[in-house]
From Swiss-Prot:
Assembly behavior: Tetramer of two alpha and two beta subunits.
Organism annotation: Saccharolobus solfataricus (strain ATCC 35092 / DSM 1617 / JCM 11322 / P2) (Sulfolobus solfataricus)
NCBIfam families listed in its UniProt record: pheT_arch (TIGR00471)
Entry keyword Acetylation: no
Main localisation: cytoplasm
Name assigned to this protein: Phenylalanine--tRNA ligase beta subunit
BP-aspect Gene Ontology terms: phenylalanyl-tRNA aminoacylation
Positions of the B5 domain: 268-343
Length: 544
C-alpha cells in the first residue's frame, strides 16, 4: 500500500460529495481513509494504482463510479516548439518530456505525487526519476539530455551559490541519497539548456533556476530512467493527472542523437484488452450481460464496445495496472461493489496432506536426532566467498554482502557454523535439512530447487568412518541399501571421500574435509561431512 495525505475539503469539493460517501467509494477502489487532523486525511492506496496518487486522479475515478463522467477522460493536447535531444547517457539511457500549460497546481500535493511515483514505479529513483520545472524560467526551446563532467557547475535547488556536481554529492542531502545511482566514470546525466546551463542532474536534484513557486502555471516535465516502458508510463500518468487539474498537455519532440528514436512525447499509450462475457461471469459468480459489463467498464473510466460478441476495452494511458483480462474483471467487481457480490462457498472433495518429500524430510530429521546429531538452522542465503562450487545464483542487489548468493550445498554453511563454534564441547555433531538451488541446464532458469540433508562431526580426532556409520544407519532404517564409490573432490582429502550410490544413482557425498578448506573457513580441528540428496532419494522411494 502507498499512503498519501490530502486536504479533505479540496478533495470533497472537486467531487461534490460528503466524507462518508468518499470513504465508501474509495473502499470499492481498494483504498482506505484515516483522519490526520481537521483539514487533512490519509489515504492508503493499492501500490498498482499509480493514477490514484493525487487528488485529481482520485476525483477522476470517483466521478466515474458516481456516473458524473463515464469512459476515458479526454484532455486538451497541443504541439509545442520544444525539443528534447537525447544523447548517449550510459547509466540512464532513456528520457522523455512534456509541457503542461495553465494547470491549477497545488505545490505541496504535486511534490508528494512526484515522490510517491519515485518510490513506486521509480524504485526510489533507480528505475525512473522525474524533474518538474517552471516552464517560463527555461530560456530555450531546445533542451538536451547528455553526460557532463563532475566539475560542471550549477546552483542546486534551494542553494544560493554555484556548486560542482562533486560538491553536490558531498554537501547536499539529495546528493548523498541518490548520487551513487547514476554517476559513473567521472560523468553524470544532466538536463541542460541549449546554452549548456543545467536544469537538473537526474536522479539527484533540479537546478534552483527552474524552481516552482505559487505563481507557476506552466511546467516542463522530464522523466529519465533505465526502462523505456517505465519512463513512458510515468510521464503518461503525470500529464494525465495534471490535465485533470485543467492543464493542457504540450507535446515535446524527442530526438536521439543517433537518429534511432524520433517521436512526440508524451506517448499517451493506449491498449486494447478483450474480455469474454462468460469468463467475467465465471470469475465474479454472477450473470450479467455484455451491455452491463460495458457499463461497469465505462464507470471505471475506460472505453468499451462490443464487436462480434467480443468485448473490447480501450485502456487509457493512466491505467498502467491493467495487464490482462483478469484486471478488467477486477475493475468490474469494483464498479459493482465488493459488498454487492455474494461470496461462494468453497466445496472440496479432497483433503490436504503432506507430500512425500516433506514426510521423508521429517523422518530423516527424527532419525538424525536419534543418531546423536543436533539440528541447526541456517539462512538459505550465504556469502558467495564461502561457496565451494562456481555454479551458483548470485544476488545482484543484496541488502548485505554477507547474504549475496543462494547456497547450492549445505556443506559450506555447516563449515561456517562449525568455524564459529569451535569453543564448544567436543565432539560437535550437527545436521541440517533444507533447500539449496543447484545448476540445471534443462530448466528455463538454468537452476532448480533441491532438498538436502548434511551431517558434520568435528573433534580432536575424527575419521571417515565416524560419519559413515550413522549415515548408513539412517539410510538402512529408511529401507535404502547403498554402496560407496570412491570419488575425488576438492572439498575432501584425496582417497578419503566417496559418493553414496543407490540403484546406480548418486544420492550423496561423504568424506574428510581437506585441510585447505578447513583453513579457508578458519577451522582448526579435523572435520568429516556427509550430504544426502533428499529430492533424489524421494524420487526413488516414491516409485516403490
Amino acid at each position: 500500500m502507498v499512503t498519501i495525505v490530502l486536504n479533505k475539503y479540496k478533495l470533497l469539493n472537486k467531487i461534490g460529495i460528503g466524507q462518508q460517501k468518499l470513504e465508501d467509494l474509495l473502499f470499492n477502489l481498494k483504498s482506505e481513509i484515516k483522519p490526520v487532523d481537521e483539514s487533512n486525511i490519509e489515504i492508503e492506496i493499492n501500490a498498482d494504482r499509480l493514477d490514484l496518487l493525487s487528488s485529481d486522479g482520485i476525483a477522476r475515478a470517483i466521478k466515474g463510479l458516481l456516473e458524473k463522467e463515464l469512459g476515458e477522460a479526454k484532455y486538451d493536447i497541443t504541439d509545442t516548439e520544444y525539443k528534447l535531444i537525447v544523447d548517449n547517457v550510459r547509466t540512464r539511457p532513456y528520457a522523455l518530456a512534456a509541457v503542461i500549460y495553465n494547470a491549477k497546481i497545488d505545490l505541496q500535493e504535486l511534490i508528494q505525487f512526484q515522490e510517491k511515483l519515485h518510490s513506486t514505479i521509480g524504485r526510489k529513483r533507480k528505475k525512473v526519476a522525474i524533474g518538474i520545472h517552471d516552464l517560463k524560467k527555461i530560456d530555450s526551446k531546445r533542451i538536451e539530455y547528455r553526460e557532463v563532467p563532475l566539475s560542471y557547475k550549477f546552483i542546486p535547488l534551494y542553494e544560493k551559490e554555484e556548486l560542482t556536481i562533486s560538491e553536490v554529492l558531498e554537501k547536499t542531502e539529495q546528493g548523498k541519497l541518490y548520487g551513487n545511482i547514476s554517476i559513473s566514470n567521472g560523468v553524470s546525466p544532466a538536463i541542460v539548456q541549449e546554452d549548456g546551463e543545467v536544469l537538473s542532474i537526474p536522479p539527484i536534484i533540479n537546478s534552483d533556476k527552474t524552481k516552482l513557486d505559487e505563481s507557476t502555471k506552466d511546467l516542463f516535465i522530464d522523466v529519465t530512467g533505465t526502462s523505456f516502458e517505465a519512463v513512458a508510463q510515468t510521464l503518461d500518468i503525470i500529464v494525465s493527472n495534471l490535465a485533470e487539474a485543467g492543464g493542457t498537455i504540450g507535446r515535446v519532440k524527442v530526438i536521439k542523437t543517433d537518429n534511432s528514436f524520433q517521436q512526440s512525447s508524451p506517448l499517451l499509450i493506449h491498449k486494447i484488452q478483450n474480455v469474454r462475457e462468460e469468463y467475467a461471469n465465471k470469475i465474479l459468480g454472477i450473470k450479467i450481460s455484455e451491455e452491463e459489463i460495458c457499463k461497469h467498464i465505462t464507470r471505471m473510466r475506460m472505453n468499451c464496445n462490443v464487436e462480434n460478441g467480443i468485448i473490447r476495452v480501450t485502456v487509457p494511458q493512466y491505467r498502467v495496472d491493467i495487464i490482462n483480462e483478469i484486471d478488467i474483471v477486477e475493475d468490474i467487481a469494483m464498479s459493482i461493489g465488493y459488498n454487492n457480490l455474494e461470496p461462494s462457498k468453497y466445496i472440496s472433495t479432497n483433503y490436504g496432506s503432506y507430500d512425500y518429500l516433506t514426510l521423508l524430510e521429517r523422518k530423516m530429521r527424527e532419525l538424525s536426532i536419534g543418531a546423536g546429531f543436533v539440528e541447526v538452522f541456517n539462512f538459505v542465503l550465504i556469502k558467495n566467498e564461502k561457496i565451494l562450487d562456481s555454479k551458483y545464483v548470485k544476488i545482484l542487489n543484496p541488502i548485505s554482502e554477507e547474504y549475496n548468493a543462494v547456497r547450492n550445498s549445505l556443506i559450506p554453511i555447516l563449515l561456517d557454523f562449525l568455524s564459529k563454534n569451535q569453543h564448544a564441547k567436543f565432539p560437535i555433531r550437527i545436521f541440517e535439512t533444507g533447500d539449496v538451488v543447484i545448476y540445471d541446464s534443462s530448466t528455463d532458469t538454468g537452476f532448480r530447487n533441491d532438498k538436502r540433508a548434511a551431517y558434520a562431526i568435528m573433534d580432536n580426532k575424527v575419521s571417515y568412518e565416524d560419519v559413515q556409520a550413522p549415515i548408513h544407519y539412517i539410510l538402512k532404517t529408511l529401507g535404502i541399501e547403498v554402496n560407496y564409490k570412491e570419488e575425488n573432490n576438492d572439498i575432501f582429502i584425496e582417497g578419503r571421500s566417496a559418493s553414496i550410490v543407490y540403484e546406480n544413482e548418486k544420492i550423496g557425498v561423504i568424506g574428510e574435509i581437506n585441510p585447505d578448506v578447513l583453513i579457508r573457513f578458519g577451522i582448526e580441528y579435523p572435520t568429516v561431512i556427509a550430504e544426502l540428496y533428499i529430492t533424489e532419494i524421494a524420487k526413488k522411494l516414491n516409485k516403490r
